Amino acid sequence: MILILKYTGATIILLSVLIEIGQLFPNNDFGCEECKLKENNIFSKPGAPVYQCMGCCFSRAYPTPLRSEKTMLVPKNITSEATCCVAKEVKRVIVNDVKLMNHTDCHCSTCYYHKF
């Protein structure tokens, strides 16, 4: 009987500690904010701000479906996908004779590293 009480007490203490640790993490952003417009300090002028999309979006990994894996040149059993913070709408502006695209709205979408 005493042994059962000891195990029960130890289990309750362990669960309490784990719950406390788990509640610390949702309050942290881990250095990456959500995808939103931020002012670009390099190109912005007083009265003429230039905005760009900055922030983080999700990424995930999952097992590659067998049908897809059979068609790959180099089969991989894990498939990953990611989205990037990109401009939904832009407006062209000229700052110091430099043509810029001022972002007006952002969202998480497919990553295009090769596009400007």
Swiss-Prot record:
User: According to the UniProt record, which cysteines are disulfide-bonded?
Assistant: C32-C56, C35-C85, C53-C106, C57-C108, C84-C111
GO biological process terms on file: G protein-coupled receptor signaling pathway; positive regulation of steroid biosynthetic process; regulation of signaling receptor activity; thyroid hormone generation
Do the record's keywords include Signal? yes
Gene Ontology cellular component annotations, sorted alphabetically: extracellular space; follicle-stimulating hormone complex
Single GO MF descriptor: protein heterodimerization activity
Tell me which UniProt keywords the record has, alphabetically.
Answer: Disulfide bond, Glycoprotein, Hormone, Secreted, Signal
Question: Is Signal tagged as a keyword?
Answer: yes
Q: What is this protein called?
A: Glycoprotein hormones alpha chain
> The organism's lineage?
Eukaryota, Metazoa, Chordata, Craniata, Vertebrata
